């Protein structure tokens, strides 16, 4: 590199020459100058801008120089040199450090060796001196056969008596117990006060008092060792030498003291702990200096003599004073009192005070920190926090449990705010959600679906039967939008809707109330305010009612959906299973119903909505919804009302009307008065009263709510009028319902003539209310048709009210359809503003409701009407009309808002004027009108027959009452029917239909047939959907209406009816004549399907098996009444209307299985009716239900048992795993503890063994060879034989003399000179001077052979072992050091290489290469010029 530097300089000079002085000539860069160059260059270049910015013409050449390979090579070489030099310096430093460390260690070792050698030499010299002295003594006393007792210490000067030492205070020691005068001087001179007088040493040796233990023994051994070793030092000459070594020993002792504090923790600490507390060491003020140096109080004096390798630690531990020990422990173990932190080491100490401190220590930390306590407290606190949220959650679910208490339906009844707001919400949403709530049949089907195949087959049948209902429910969402209007007023509706039980209960109560309530009761009811009051628990109702209640509560999918669904459920909630359950649980459910009703009242309290509907409108919605609505307050009551218009209204009236009729609904005074004479009047009054309260409730309660309550109480009314009512109440929402509208239309048409005066009132109310349009439509219809009062009167007079109702419905339909059918939108928005739509709904509702509800109403309501007002004039048709009218009037009244509603039947007469006989007002309807009415009746019958469950429910409920039974018997009698009706419909037809509907066997057959013909339903629907509308539209003209009025007045309804049937048959060109004739008589007309309102608003008559779920086809919203077989009247509340019909027919009965309506072909209707069911099909549904329930229970039990067993099995598995894990952990923990204990024990035992072996080695007598040459017994051997007393004789005497002396190999451990006296041997006769000594203890056993050889061999072996250990340790340490050094060197090389590369790369920058500073010293100001440099000099960079 040195050679290359000049070249580099030359190259730079040559390259830079053009620039002249502008650029300073770079100087060779050496590593040692780099640091200096950087600042210098910076100072030189950067101050001047002209230098900083190179001329542009010179930049290319400079750049070429910088980029040249030679220049880069130079830079790299320079850098390598610098880095190499740095590495060399680092390595040299490291090596020097290592060498110094090694030298220090070697010097320390040398010093230690020297000290050890000095000690060894000193001991040897002392031994040699002692032997010399002993030899001199023996020579002086050769005449005495004296076996040298080494344990007796004689004073050097013989004139001094020997110092007697007791066994308690002295171990075997040297002969001389007192240092010679000569040694005292040096000792004092070298280490003043450093020597420890023998007395002190003796007094300090109190180890024998210690309790024997392994550690104590070890200490004894160590102490003994020190004594044995120290004995050699305590000869005359030892004192001085001990002092000489004193300084060094003091240092050594200091080190050992430190070791005591440090390393002694392991072994010495344990010894110290065990010994110190047991033996209070006496610390004498002998060596204060040494005490300072080493915590051992008197360790120094002896340590100087006893620095042998083996006993080093033991001696230190032995002499430690308690204070020192405490210090040591404090240092070594945190358990010492000084240490505050409780350390696990502390417990190891055996000091009594240390352990207590340990305990206290632990307790104190616990008190201070309180980790466990704090943790516990915090945990406890946290737990409550967690718990609180948990508790809150249940509270949140409170509404749920409230529900559970009362039942699903009752849940919304809770008085909490939730009900209120929920009601409103649900009422709003209920329109869309009504379909959510599955009907009881659907639930049963779902339940069965989970059961075996047989049950699933049954479930399929049920689902098929319920199909219509389901469809209705599906279509109901469209209509539901209207319900929100009321929903706002009735927040609790949603809750009621959500609770099926409520609806069911209402139905049941209604049924019960039906008996109790009378027309007068309805009259009594002043306003819907009664709804608010809690209805008294209704008497036990029929099992069907109970079943409905039960079935309804089963599910509450959504509060919103619940309203519609509940209503629908109320209608079809009665499933066979539920019927069975109801029968068995009738009483219980009645009680529940009463309770639920109470709750409902509260819930429905908000039903009173400012929305004012025309009485007519209210009558309709209230007919349906008043039953429903009133039941909401008292669901059970109202719902029964709708099934039996009269009974239902009465029942509703007891609960709701008792409180008072709503303002809109005026008590049907006039109407009741006019109708009081006839059962129809009574029915109408009761219905009116019910409808009025219902209307008010409808206002307040969401339409869905009304629908719910209505299904049970006013299912028929709901279908006929109730279905339309919702549209009227909620014209916008409800109008879409075509089927309900058709029913409503039919009902309204039929009852419009009767309700015409109410209609007028309705008009007035409509004008008053926002829904005047609805009222206007009814008013228009009513104006065309005879007044309600007149119609009622006519009906009372006319033999067949059913026909009249049909005709009236036709007339009203004819009048209204023109207006209503014109706009489907208006019909859909019935409530909103379209009078025509209201009328259309009424018409449609009348038609569809009539078609559906009429069959039930006629069969059921007629008997009721007759029973209430036993008027034989009211024939089966009339009774049907009464029911239909009850429903129709409400339907019409809805159009005429509250006026018609309140006065539609009973109120129309009261509020406005008792309806005079409508004969003059109503023109006798023409044959076409009659045919249309018959067709509507047929449609109603078909609808009712399509849902035999509803029909049977109605029949069961009505037939259970005496009045209804009477009315039915009258209807079946020729006198009531009349010759014309008999001709049209054979007398036995109705009875046969009733019997079939009422017989489970027939019902099963009908269901099976309906199912088998399920494929025909859609086709028939399609084929006949538009026929009924056409027929009805064409049938009722003004002339026909006049003819109908005349026939009603003159009692010629029979002839007119027959003619109208013929005309209708001709017009329709279908099987209507046959089916109609049969259907009209039996009220079970199969041919006419319920009228369906299309989007256009035109009525489409679905002929054919309308009874079956014809497939609700709501063009926009309303479901065809034909769908009524299982569908709701209103498309908005299709389920509700269907349910309403079903419940109206049997609100209390559970006829859910029959929900799927039979599609009776008009042609085959007769055959079906006449045909007897086979024995197999006559199997009791109850039995079937029992079997199903039993199977379901069994399956559930099996499934639950399996689940429980599986869960238990899983738990067992988990428990097994946990137990195994825990047991394994415990075993491992115990094993670990055992290992630890074993290790400790082994270590302790090995240490003890080693220390014992070493102590023995040290205690072995070091026999020095005899120099006198005599072999008599010159060897000073000690043998392990106890001597109480022995006589030492001269060795060369006889054997007896020798035997008297102690054997050579067993001298005593301690001897005391008792005295000397001449003694004569009795064998040899020699008299010898003898010394009597007393020996104590036991010496070390030895071999009779010479000890010097063995001692020397052992010493040699020990030294060799030490040397070998030293060599091995040195080799290992050297290897380890070299390996670590090599690793560090490799790491350093790697780091250096990486750093070189990084540094080189970082330095090879534009500024470094072209800048003013050195290549690796970038100026601090580079940032200022970097951008400029890059931009100017290195545009490409």
Swiss-Prot record:
Signal peptide extent: none
InterPro entries (alphabetical): CellDiv_DevSignal_Domain (IPR052318), IQ_motif_EF-hand-BS (IPR000048), P-loop_NTPase (IPR027417)
Summary of the knockout phenotype: knockout male mice fail to produce offspring, while in females, fertility is normal. Males have normal testis weight and size with normal spermatogenesis and sperm count. However, they exhibit defects in sperm morphology with abnormal acrosome structure.
Biased composition (Low complexity): 422-440
Tissue/organ expression: Expressed in testis, in elongating spermatids (at protein level).
Membrane-spanning ranges: none
Keywords: Developmental protein, Repeat
Coiled coil feature spans: none
Polar residues bias: start-end ranges: 861-878
CDD domains recorded: IQCD
GO biological process: single fertilization; sperm flagellum assembly; spermatid development
Disordered: annotated span: 332-353, 416-440, 848-878
IQ domain ranges (all copies): 84-112, 1190-1216, 1217-1239, 1240-1258, 1361-1389, 1390-1413
Assembly and binders: Interacts with calmodulin.
Reported function: Essential for spermiogenesis and fertilization. May be required for manchette assembly in elongating spermatids.
Name of the protein this chain belongs to: IQ domain-containing protein N
Species name: Mus musculus
Lineage: Eukaryota, Metazoa, Chordata, Craniata, Vertebrata
Gene that this polypeptide is encoded by: Iqcn
């Amino acid at each position: 590199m040195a050679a290359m530097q000049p070249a580099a300089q030359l190259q730079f000079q040559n390259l830079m020459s053009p620039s002249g002085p502008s650029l300073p000539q770079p100087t060779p860069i050496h590593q040692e100058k780099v640091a200096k160059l950087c600042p210098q260059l910076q100072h030189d270049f950067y101050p001047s801008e002209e230098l900083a910015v190179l001329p542009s013409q010179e930049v290319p050449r400079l750049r070429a120089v910088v980029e040249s390979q030679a220049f880069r090579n130079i830079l790299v070489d320079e850098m390598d040199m610098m880095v190499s030099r740095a590495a060399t310096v680092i390595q040299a430093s490291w090596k020097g450090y290592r060498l110094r460390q090694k030298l220090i260690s070697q010097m320390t070792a040398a010093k230690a060796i020297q000290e050890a050698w000095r000690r060894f030499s000193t001991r040897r010299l002392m031994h040699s001196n002692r032997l010399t002295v002993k030899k001199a003594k023996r020579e002086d006393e050769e005449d005495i056969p004296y076996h040298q007792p080494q344990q007796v210490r004689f004073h050097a000067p013989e004139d001094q008596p020997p110092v007697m030492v007791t066994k308690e205070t002295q171990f075997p020691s040297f002969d001389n117990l007192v240092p010679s005068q000569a040694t005292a001087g040096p000792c004092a001179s070298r280490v003043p006060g450093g020597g420890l007088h023998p007395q002190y040493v003796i007094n300090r040796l109190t180890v024998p008092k210690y309790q024997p233990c392994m550690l104590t023994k070890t200490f004894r051994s160590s102490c003994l060792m020190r004594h044995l070793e120290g004995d050699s030092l305590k000869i005359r000459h030892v004192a001085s030498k001990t002092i000489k070594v004193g300084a060094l020993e003091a240092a050594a002792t200091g080190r050992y003291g430190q070791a005591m504090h440090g390393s002694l923790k392991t072994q010495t600490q344990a010894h110290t702990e065990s010994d110190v507390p047991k033996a209070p060491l006496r610390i004498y003020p002998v060596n204060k200096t040494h005490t300072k140096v080493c915590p051992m109080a008197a360790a120094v004096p002896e340590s100087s003599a006893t620095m042998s390798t083996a006993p080093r630690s033991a001696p230190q531990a032995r002499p430690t004073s308690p204070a020192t020990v405490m210090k040591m422990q404090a240092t070594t173990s945190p358990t010492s009192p000084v240490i505050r932190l409780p350390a696990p080491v502390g417990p190891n100490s055996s000091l009594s005070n240390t352990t207590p401190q340990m305990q206290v220590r632990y307790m104190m930390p616990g008190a201070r920190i309180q980790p466990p306590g704090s943790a516990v407290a915090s945990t406890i606190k946290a737990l409550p926090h967690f718990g609180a949220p948990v508790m809150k959650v249940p509270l949140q679910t409170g509404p749920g449990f409230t529900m559970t208490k009362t039942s699903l339906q009752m849940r919304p009844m809770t008085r909490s705010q939730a009900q209120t707001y929920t009601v409103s919400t649900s009422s709003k949403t209920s329109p869309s959600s009504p379909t959510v709530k599955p009907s009881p049949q659907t639930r049963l089907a779902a339940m069965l679906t989970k059961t075996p195949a047989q049950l699933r087959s049954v479930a399929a049948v049920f689902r098929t039967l319920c199909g219509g209902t389901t469809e209705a429910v599906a279509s109901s969402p469209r209509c539901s939008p209207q319900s929100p209007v009321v929903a706002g007023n009735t927040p609790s509706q949603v809750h009621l809707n959500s609770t099926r039980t409520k609806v069911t209960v209402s139905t049941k109560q209604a049924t019960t109330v039906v008996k109790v309530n009378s027309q007068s009761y309805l009259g009594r009811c002043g306003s819907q305010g009664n709804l608010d009051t809690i209805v008294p628990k209704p008497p036990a109702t029929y099992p069907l009612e109970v079943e409905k209640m039960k079935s309804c509560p089963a599910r509450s999918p959504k509060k919103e959906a619940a309203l519609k669904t509940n209503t629908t459920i109320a209608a079809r909630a009665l499933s066979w299973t539920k019927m069975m359950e109801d029968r068995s649980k009738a009483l219980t459910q009645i009680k529940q119903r009463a309770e639920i009703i109470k709750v409902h009242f509260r819930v429905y309290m908000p039903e009173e909505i400012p929305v004012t509907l025309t009485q007519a409108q209210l009558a309709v919605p209230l007919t349906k919804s008043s039953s429903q609505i009133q039941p909401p307050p008292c669901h059970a009551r109202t719902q029964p009302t709708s099934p039996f218009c009269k009974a239902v209204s009465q029942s509703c009236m007891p609960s709701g009307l008792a409180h008072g009729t709503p303002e809109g609904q005026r008590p049907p005074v006039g109407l009741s008065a006019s109708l009081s004479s006839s059962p129809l009047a009574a029915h109408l009054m009761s219905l009116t009263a019910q409808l009025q309260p219902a209307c008010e409730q409808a206002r307040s309660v969401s339409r869905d709510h009304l629908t719910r309550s209505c299904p049970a109480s006013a299912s028929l009314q709901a279908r006929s009028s109730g279905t339309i009512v919702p549209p009227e109440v909620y014209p916008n929402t409800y109008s879409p319902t075509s089927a309900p509208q058709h029913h409503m239309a039919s009902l309204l048409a039929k009852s419009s003539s009767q309700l015409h005066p109410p209609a007028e009132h309705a008009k007035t109310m409509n004008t008053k209310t926002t829904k005047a349009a609805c009222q206007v439509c009814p008013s228009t219809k009513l104006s065309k048709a005879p007044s309600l009062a007149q119609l009622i009167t006519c009906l009372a007079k006319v033999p067949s009210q059913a026909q009249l109702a049909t005709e009236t419905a036709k007339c009203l339909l004819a009048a209204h359809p023109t207006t209503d059918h014109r706009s489907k939108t208006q019909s859909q928005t019935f409530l909103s503003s379209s009078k025509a739509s209201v009328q259309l709904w009424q018409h449609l509702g009348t038609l569809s409701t009539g078609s559906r509800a009429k069959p039930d109403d006629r069969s059921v309501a007629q008997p009721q009407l007759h029973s209430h007002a036993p008027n034989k004039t009211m024939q089966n048709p009339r009774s049907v009309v009464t029911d239909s009218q009850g429903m129709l009037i409400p339907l019409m009244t809805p159009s005429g808002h509250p006026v018609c509603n309140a006065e539609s039947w009973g109120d129309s007469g009261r509020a406005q004027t008792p309806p005079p006989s409508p004969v003059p007002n109503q023109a006798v309807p023409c044959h076409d009108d009659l045919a249309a009415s018959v067709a509507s009746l047929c449609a109603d019958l078909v609808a009712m027959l399509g849902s035999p469950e509803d029909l049977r429910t109605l029949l069961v409920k009505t037939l259970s009452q005496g009045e209804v039974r009477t009315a039915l018997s009258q209807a079946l009698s020729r006198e009531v029917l009349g010759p014309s009706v008999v001709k049209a419909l054979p007398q036995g037809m109705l009875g046969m239909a009733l019997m079939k509907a009422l017989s489970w066997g027939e019902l099963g057959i009908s269901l099976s047939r309906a199912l088998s013909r399920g494929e025909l339903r859609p086709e028939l629907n399609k084929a006949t959907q538009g026929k009924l509308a056409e027929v009805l539209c064409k049938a009722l003209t003004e002339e026909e209406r006049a003819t109908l009025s005349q026939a009603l007045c003159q009692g010629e309804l029979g002839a007119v009816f027959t003619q109208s049937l013929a005309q209708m048959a001709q017009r329709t060109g279908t099987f209507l004549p046959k089916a109609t004739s049969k259907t009209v008589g039996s009220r079970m007309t199969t041919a006419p399907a319920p009228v369906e309102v299309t989007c256009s608003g035109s009525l489409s008559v679905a002929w054919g098996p309308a009874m079956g779920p014809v497939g609700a086809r709501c063009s926009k919203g309303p479901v065809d009444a034909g769908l009524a077989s299982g569908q709701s009247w209103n498309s908005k509340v299709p389920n509700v209307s269907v349910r309403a019909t079903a419940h109206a027919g049997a609100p209390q009965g559970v006829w859910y299985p029959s929900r799927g309506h039979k599609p009776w072909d008009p042609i085959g209707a007769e055959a079906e009716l006449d045909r007897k069911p086979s024995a197999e099909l006559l199997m009791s549904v109850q039995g079937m239900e029992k079997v199903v329930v039993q199977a379901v229970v069994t399956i559930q039990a099996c499934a639950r048992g399996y689940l429980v067993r599986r869960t238990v099995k899983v738990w067992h598995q988990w428990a097994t795993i946990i137990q195994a894990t825990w047991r394994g952990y415990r075993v491992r923990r115990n094993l670990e503890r055992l290992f630890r204990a074993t290790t400790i024990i082994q270590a302790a035992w090995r240490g003890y063994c080693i220390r014992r072996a070493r102590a023995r080695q040290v205690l072995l007598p070091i026999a020095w060879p005899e120099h006198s040459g005599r072999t008599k017994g010159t060897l000073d051997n000690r043998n392990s034989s106890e001597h109480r007393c022995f006589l030492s004789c001269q060795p060369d005497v006889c054997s007896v003399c020798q035997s008297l002396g102690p054997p050579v190999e067993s001298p005593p451990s301690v001897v005391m000179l008792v005295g000397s006296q001449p003694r004569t041997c009795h064998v040899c006769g020699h008299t010898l001077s003898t010394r009597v000594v007393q020996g104590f203890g036991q010496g070390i056993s030895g071999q009779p052979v010479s000890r010097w050889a063995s001692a020397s061999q052992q010493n040699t072996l020990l030294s060799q072992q030490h040397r070998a250990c030293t060599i091995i340790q040195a080799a290992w340490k050297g290897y380890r050091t070299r390996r670590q050094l090599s690793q560090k060197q490799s790491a350093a090389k790697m780091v250096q290489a990486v750093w070189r590369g990084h540094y080189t790369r970082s330095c090879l920058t534009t500024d470094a290469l072209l800048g003013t500073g050195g290549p690796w010293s970038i100026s601090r100001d580079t940032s200022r010029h970097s951008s400029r440099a890059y931009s100017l000099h290195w545009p490409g960079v």
